[in-house]
Amino acid sequence: MRPFRCLSGVTAAIIAALGCAALAAAASNLKLDFAKDTVGAEPTALVSVVGIWRIESEKGKNVLAVDGRQWKEGQSSVGIADKARALYGERYAEFLDRVQAYAYYPYVVAKDVPDFNNGEMTVRFEGISGRIDQGAGILFNLKPNGDYLTIRANCLENNLVLWKFEKGKRSSVKWVRDTPTPSRQWHDLKVRIAGAKVEGWLDGKLYLEHTLPEPVSGRVGLWSKADSHVYFDDFTVTPAD
């Protein structure tokens, strides 16, 4: 397993600033189909932290693409310095100074969901290409220090995994094999949260169940890995009643 070192300074800057921008403690409903976004641009409702994320057209419909075809270790998102400056003003430099230029796992963060702790998140995805990976995940429990969890599917491996990213290192929490996920087909991924209980669903089937040591609480987003070129659509975040 390869080591992971997060973009500690800028990532922490972005996450903390997002938290300051949203004072409400409860999670917000979110439904994104990217129809009003501009093809070729980054998504307006998601903050691109690591990797190349942009809107592409697929059969005349806007989708969100993570494009790892020119992936390199240490590839932060385009304009990361400007994003940090916009979020932190004159303080941005101190965060950029802490950046460790090594990022293996692309992800975006939902701007308008300050804290999610109960409910479900869904997204549709299609693996397009990738020789190393074709990973598509829902990121959750994202903390200001950059720690987070993700449940991800992989079109090359046909498995569903709950990963933990903590103190700059990745470790598997729960691993489920034999989850058919063909490339070039759309799939439905769902993560359901109830306190510390986590469920992972793929194409309408419950595959993964796990109880964490502590209840989930943090920001959410979408996740991928390495050279994956994957389409995402219809990302929803629905808090429990």
What are these regions (language model features)?
Residues 166-188:
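Short, aromatic/His-centered strand-loop micro-motif at the edge of beta-sheets
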Residues 24-27:
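Boundary at the C-terminal end of the N-terminal hydrophobic targeting segment
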Residues 34, 121-123, 185-194, 198-200:
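Short tryptophan-centered beta-strand motifs in secreted/extracellular beta-sheet-rich domains
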Residues 41-91:
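Extracellular glycan-recognition surfaces and repeat-rich motifs
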Residues 10-22:
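Bacterial N-terminal signal peptides
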Residues 217-241:
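Ligand-recognition surfaces built from glycine- and aromatic
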Residues 71-161, 165:
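Secretory/extracellular carbohydrate-interaction modules
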Residues 201-221:
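Short, solvent-exposed beta-strand-to-loop segments that form ligand-recognition rims
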